[in-house]
């Protein structure tokens, strides 16, 4: 019973965490579940109020299933012969057990087709997966096409393969989850086709930005790994990952054993030290916050489309409407079947919903709100065949993502060890020895996606449809398959999926002329900075101007142009902007090295978001009567995801200061709750009080905190960090120099007071140091003492630490 209680409690805590629920009172009656495949009678009586949109089985079917499972588990005579339960094949394929789209037979057919370029073998594969299971394996298995009675149109009148494949994308799979060989192979293949690959949330090595292996879609997830100005300007599309189909509501956790030196470099973290992704984006707590991030990223790269990734769930249409109003140009609705092999099993099996429900709801809701022509809808999650793509398009999608299937083309054999770094095919591993086994080629992926487009064209010809745009939303060309009256299929009701609210025109899709206008030409960046600064000159220049809190993402556009021209090669302070007034949201977001923003006044939330080498200085106006160190001068979530650069703030910051900082240096005179949360690098100096939960999830970097009242230990989260006195000469010199620079730039009275009596204040400082980070730095230092250079020392230190675990 103790084990059972522990398991049940763990399950409740896990689900509450996914849903952002903190207390059991909020969990009770929250109705956060949706039923799929259960009849209305059962729902109304036993799960009153729970959403169940497609009907399904009744009590008699549930009873039959329970009895079958019981009989399989227990001897009919009650003898304790073998009490071990059989593996039902839910996770790994087992012959005669649960159906899997990829099983030994289908894997063989699929890989033979891709490796040899044999379209006939591919047709055998799609025939098998499209007709799998007595009752089907997807909601789309219950649908069929209503072909044109006149036989359709000639195939050569249908949109060509070369055009269709430009709508194909590689689903987001991170460099870190995939080996560099696999990640680059996917990017090269999609680039050659004219489609787009996706970096995933792990960043991308800079050397790939302007090569054939550049991923055209750059993802921005909650951890902001590798999100720099250079990363963003190299994109044709920027995707905001709000959730992941296979594990919605969960943040990632990359164990230290998988943070190889090259992964740490790309993610701006420390070799061998675990990385924690926050479950939410800490700059998104409302649809308005999401609109702000969309705006910020559009400023960071004016030429990129902004894509928002959602997960199929009840109400996703309402969220999508808000996303469309917020300016997104693409909305991805991801289904539960998308597959990170590293997700927990309960997430893989029991979280998220079929994309058929999400795509249909999103398409319908956008039509009803007059927003459908503003955005493209994208679907992904186990799209395998031309039939899958056709149905997805007919339910409302215009672009299509492929994930698991691309791994299969490169040799994946479904060992289900993606999370263990032991992939025998060199696909989902960073182990150099296992990566030698990688035999994937871009040509295999090109063969597969060409086959899908070719098969899609065949369906379109039979339907009498000439272009993809003509096919979007055409649910009138779908019907539910007939089924025996007593079968489970017959109990399903797919009317909600097939409903088309477009009364006048059944074919409503994206129209370029209706795209959201951000009015970037009206920003101060475009009207002032781009005109007054000579971008062609590296001679130090400065501009003075007034700002107000309506000037959002100030500096981001000009910063992006600096990055395009110079990368990160400029010295500090080449372009300096002296601002007066109230800085708007995301002041100085993503600004690169060479750009300095000095603000005399105060600043709103998200200051220095994604700081990429630039410098920020905030100070109160002269002649103030209050003490800066006792008053808030910048808002919440400053320096979120900063990767490099400096920030000096003469005053107090709001909550979540430097959350996910991975390389910036900051000096501030007080912070709110959750300071330095999930930090993985950089240095933070706090010359005053902190709020509670300081350093929660912090796995890298160093913080120096002034603890005048000797009570800081009560407000720090000591799960991953230690508190130490500042005694080492390097620490003392670093701290003193940063305070000196802070005083020089801001004129801080508090900083000057500390410097004038530094020996008195020094014992009151605490050094916040993550355990794993400290250990790894010591091992690296010992390797360098043996004569190894920096990179080789990191590699040897990584293997030494893993060997001793």
Name these PLM-found stretches.
Residues 1-6, 14-17, 96-100, 112-115, ...:
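Hydrophobic alpha-helical scaffolding
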Residues 1-229, 235-237, 241-248, 257, ...:
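Flexible, glycine-rich loop/tail regions that form catalytic "lids" or insertion modules at the edges
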Residues 3, 7, 19-22, 120, ...:
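Conserved active-site and cofactor/substrate-binding residues in soluble primary-metabolism enzymes
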Residues 13, 24-25, 38-46, 227, ...:
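Alpha/beta enzyme core
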Residues 15-26, 198-202, 301-309, 372, ...:
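Flexible, glycine/charged-enriched surface loops at secondary-structure junctions
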Residues 434-435, 446, 459-463, 472-475, ...:
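Long, distal/terminal scaffolding or interaction modules
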């Amino acid at each position: 019973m103790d084990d059972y209680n522990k398991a049940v409690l763990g399950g409740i805590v896990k689900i509450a965490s996914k849903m952002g629920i903190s207390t059991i009172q909020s969990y009770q009656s929250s109705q956060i579940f949706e039923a799929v495949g259960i009849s209305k009678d059962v729902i109304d009586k036993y799960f009153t109020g729970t959403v169940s949109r497609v009907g399904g089985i009744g009590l008699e079917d549930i009873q039959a299933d329970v009895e079958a499972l019981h009989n399989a588990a227990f001897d009919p005579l009650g003898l304790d012969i073998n009490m071990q339960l059989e593996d039902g094949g839910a996770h790994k394929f087992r012959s005669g057990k649960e159906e899997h789209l990829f099983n030994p037979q289908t894997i063989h057919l699929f890989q033979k087709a891709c490796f040899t370029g044999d379209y006939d073998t591919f047709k055998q594969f799609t025939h098998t997966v499209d007709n799998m299971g007595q009752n089907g394996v997807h909601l789309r298995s219950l649908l069929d096409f209503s072909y044109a009675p006149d036989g359709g149109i000639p195939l050569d009148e249908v949109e060509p393969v070369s055009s269709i494949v430009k709508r194909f994308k590689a689903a987001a799979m991170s460099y870190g989850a995939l080996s560099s060989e696999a990640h680059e192979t996917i990017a090269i293949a999609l680039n050659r086709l004219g489609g787009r690959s996706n970096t995933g949330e792990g960043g991308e090595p800079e050397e790939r930005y302007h090569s054939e292996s550049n991923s055209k879609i750059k993802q921005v997830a909650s951890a902001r790994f590798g999100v720099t100005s250079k990363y963003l300007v190299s994109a044709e599309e920027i995707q905001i990952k709000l959730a992941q189909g296979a594990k919605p509501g969960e943040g990632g956790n990359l164990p230290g054993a998988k943070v190889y030196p090259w992964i740490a470099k790309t993610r701006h973290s420390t070799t061998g030290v675990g990385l924690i992704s926050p479950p939410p984006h800490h700059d998104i707590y409302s649809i308005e916050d999401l609109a702000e991030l969309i705006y910020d990223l559009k400023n960071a790269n004016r030429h990129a489309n902004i894509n928002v990734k959602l997960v199929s769930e009840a109400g996703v249409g309402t969220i999508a409407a808000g996303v469309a109003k917020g300016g997104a140009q693409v909305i991805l609705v991801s289904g539960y079947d998308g597959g990170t092999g590293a997700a927990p099993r309960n997430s893989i099996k029991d979280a998220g919903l079929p994309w058929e429900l999400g795509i249909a709801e999103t398409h319908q809701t956008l039509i009803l709100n007059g927003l459908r022509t503003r955005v493209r809808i994208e679907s992904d999650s186990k799209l395998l065949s031309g039939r899958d793509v056709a149905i997805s398009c007919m339910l409302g999608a215009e672009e299509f993502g492929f994930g698991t299937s691309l791994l299969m083309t490169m040799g994946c054999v479904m060992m289900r060890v993606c999370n263990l770094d032991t992939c025998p095919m060199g696909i989902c591993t960073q182990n150099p020895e296992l990566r030698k086994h990688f035999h994937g080629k871009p040509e295999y992926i090109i063969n597969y996606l060409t086959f899908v487009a070719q098969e899609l064209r065949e369906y379109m010809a039979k339907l009498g449809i000439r272009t993809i745009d003509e096919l979007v939303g055409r649910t009138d060309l779908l019907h539910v398959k007939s089924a025996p009256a007593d079968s489970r299929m017959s109990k399903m009701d797919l009317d909600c999926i097939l409903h088309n609210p477009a009364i006048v025109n059944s074919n409503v899709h994206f129209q370029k002329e209706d795209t959201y206008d951000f009015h970037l030409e009206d920003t101060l960046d475009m009207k002032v900075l781009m005109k007054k600064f000579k971008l062609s000159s590296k001679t130090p220049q400065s501009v003075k101007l007034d700002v107000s809190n309506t000037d959002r993402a100030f500096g981001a556009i000009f910063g992006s142009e600096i990055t395009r021209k110079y990368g990160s090669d400029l010295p500090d302070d080449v372009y300096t902007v002296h601002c007066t007034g109230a800085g708007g949201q995301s002041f100085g977001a993503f600004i690169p090295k060479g750009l300095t923003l000095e603000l005399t006044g105060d600043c709103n939330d998200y200051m220095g978001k994604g700081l990429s080498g630039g410098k920020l200085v905030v100070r109160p106006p002269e002649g103030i009567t209050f003490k800066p160190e006792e008053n808030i001068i910048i808002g919440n979530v400053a320096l979120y995801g900063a990767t490099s650069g400096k920030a000096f703030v003469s005053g107090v910051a709001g909550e979540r200061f430097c959350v996910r900082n991975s390389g910036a240096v900051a000096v501030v005179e007080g912070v709110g709750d959750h300071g330095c949360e999930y930090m993985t690098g950089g240095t933070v100096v706090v010359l005053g009080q902190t709020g509670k939960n300081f350093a929660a999830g912090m796995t890298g970097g160093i913080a120096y905190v002034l603890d005048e009242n000797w009570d800081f230990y009560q407000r720090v989260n000591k799960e991953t960090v230690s508190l130490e006195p500042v005694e080492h000469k390097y620490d003392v010199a670093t701290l003193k120099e940063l305070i000196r620079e802070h005083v020089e730039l801001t004129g801080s009275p508090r900083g000057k007071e500390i410097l004038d009596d530094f020996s008195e204040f020094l014992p009151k400082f605490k050094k916040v140091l993550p355990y794993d980070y400290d250990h790894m730095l010591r091992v690296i230092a010992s390797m360098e003492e043996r004569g190894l250079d920096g990179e080789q020392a990191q590699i040897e230190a990584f293997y030494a630490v893993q060997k001793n675990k």
